[in-house]
Amino acid sequence: KSPKWIAKRGRILRRDSYECQNCKRYFKTKTATTVHHIYFYEDYPKLSLVSWNLISLCSECHNKMHNRFDDTPTKLGISLQEKKKKEFENWLYPPTNRDKN
């Protein structure tokens, strides 16, 4: 784990008040222990330190995001990716000045 990742992880946990953001959706309070890459690091390493691609989760919810047999996103993981689809598309295909006219 790089020094940049360690620093970024701390910033994301602070941003999310050290609370699991998935549990919070269900009005539960659980301490986040993991910072999850919404679009997986293995597939998109350039997104590894991008804030919108990171979310604080408890270990139980983090395990619900990954299929542990083949490390693909689960249904829950895919739904999280869908929520960030606009940010992902803007990263993948940045708008140009030409697009604004």
Predicted stretch roles:
Residues W52-N53, K64-N67, K86-L92:
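Short C-terminal domain-edge/linker segments immediately following a structured domain
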Residues K4-T34, C58-E60:
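Short cysteine-rich loop/turn motifs with clustered Cys
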Residues L13, P45, T96-D99:
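Amphipathic alpha-helical interaction segments
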Residues R25-K28, A32, L54-G77:
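Short Cys/His-centered divalent metal-binding micro-motifs
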Residues K46, C58-C61, Q81-K84:
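Glycine-rich loops and low-complexity Gly/Arg-rich segments
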Residues Y39-L54:
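Short linker/helix segments within small regulatory modules
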Residues Y18, Y39, M65-T72, D99-N101:
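Intrinsic disorder/low-complexity detector
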Residues K1-A7, K24-T29, T72-N101:
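A boundary/linker detector
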